[in-house]
């Protein structure tokens, strides 16, 4: 992690970098091999609950654009991403906040196999920038920012001001022409209040499941999908798809996922700090942050408060804790 004054600290965890377009294609192929049907060029427009003569919920009637519509189904698992289609159609939740993300794939990027996270508000307002190494000297260089209109300009300015300046940018494999930049929007408000209804569960970004500080979401999506699949199978077998039974899904992910409220408060506190405050905080961290136990964290807090007592009033402790909760073992990054 690189802070505004250039102070760099390590938080070491082993992990994998996914070529996401290949990973998602593989998931789809695996599903089809197990009997799923993959229907492209379809857009859901409406969802209507179905009931039997006794008023018991029996499933959904879905309509929209595409040759397979209308579709009748017992359970819907909404994995529609940030669009959160089912939630929007049913007015199930208020729309959450989103942040803009954009990146380039670059060639011959110097790397030590660590992911570099730059917490530099000058370029990424209430966000951060990254360098994510991939195979064969390739890397993704990008940012997320709440200043959505300035996203691409800010990324270009960051690249121009750093050692990435003269590196070649190439379009991603699925983008044959046009500007090589690619990205989209990411939910940042935390989980929706309701992630279930009669015969319905929301997973991944469609449920607001992203890591609050660094906005990663693949492992949260995969785990929530596993929970949803288990609940769907059990409730179909039990012939009870009522919301009261589907609510078990929300209990499962609530017990598994990190304390979103704490992380969001810590994130807010972090971005309330000035660049100088952030840099002083970084200088008080050990060079390797992954091994800090309770005593190590206490020592950092004491060093911070001795150097700048005013940081206590700026909620520096929640800001520091947000880093710990953003590690991979807590579904972070």
Regions found by a protein language model. Name each.
Residues 26, 30-173, 187, 192, ...:
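Predominantly flavin-linked oxidoreductase catalytic cores and closely associated redox partners
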Residues 8-11, 139-141, 209-212:
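Short small-residue beta-strand/loop micro-motif enriched in glycine and branched aliphatics
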Residues 233-333:
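C-terminal helical "tail/cap" subdomain of flavin- and related membrane-associated enzymes
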């Amino acid at each position: 992690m690189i802070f505004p004054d250039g102070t760099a600290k390590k938080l070491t965890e082993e992990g994998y970098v996914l070529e996401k377009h290949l990973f998602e294609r593989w998931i789809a192929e695996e599903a089809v091999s197990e009997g799923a049907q993959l229907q492209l060029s379809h857009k859901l427009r409406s969802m209507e609950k179905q009931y039997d003569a006794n008023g018991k919920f029996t499933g959904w009637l879905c309509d929209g654009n595409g040759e397979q519509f209308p579709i009748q189904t017992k359970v819907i698992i909404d994995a529609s991403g940030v669009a959160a289609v089912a939630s929007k159609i049913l007015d199930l939740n208020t729309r959450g906040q989103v942040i803009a993300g954009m990146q380039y794939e670059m060639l011959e990027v110097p790397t030590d196999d660590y992911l570099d996270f730059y917490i530099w508000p000058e370029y990424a307002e209430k966000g951060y920038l990254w360098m994510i190494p991939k195979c064969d000297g390739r890397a993704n260089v990008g940012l997320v920012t709440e200043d959505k209109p300035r996203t691409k300009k800010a990324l270009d300015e960051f690249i121009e001001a750093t050692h990435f300046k003269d590196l070649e940018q190439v379009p991603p494999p699925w983008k044959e022409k046009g500007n090589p930049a690619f990205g989209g929007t990411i939910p940042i408000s935390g989980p929706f209040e309701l992630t279930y209804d009669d015969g319905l569960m929301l997973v991944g970004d469609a449920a607001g499941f992203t890591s609050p500080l660094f906005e990663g979401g693949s492992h949260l999506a995969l785990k929530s999908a596993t929970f949803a699949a288990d609940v769907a199978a059990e409730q179909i077998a039990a012939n009870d798809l009522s919301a009261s039974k589907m609510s078990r899904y929300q209990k499962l992910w609530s017990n598994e996922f990190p304390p979103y409220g704490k992380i969001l408060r810590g994130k807010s506190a972090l971005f309330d700090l000035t660049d100088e405050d952030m840099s002083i905080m970084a200088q008080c961290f050990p060079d390797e942050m992954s091994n800090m136990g309770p005593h190590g964290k206490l020592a950092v807090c004491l060093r911070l408060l001795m150097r700048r007592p005013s940081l206590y009033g700026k909620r520096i402790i929640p800001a520091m804790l947000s880093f710990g909760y953003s590690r991979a073992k807590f579904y972070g990054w």
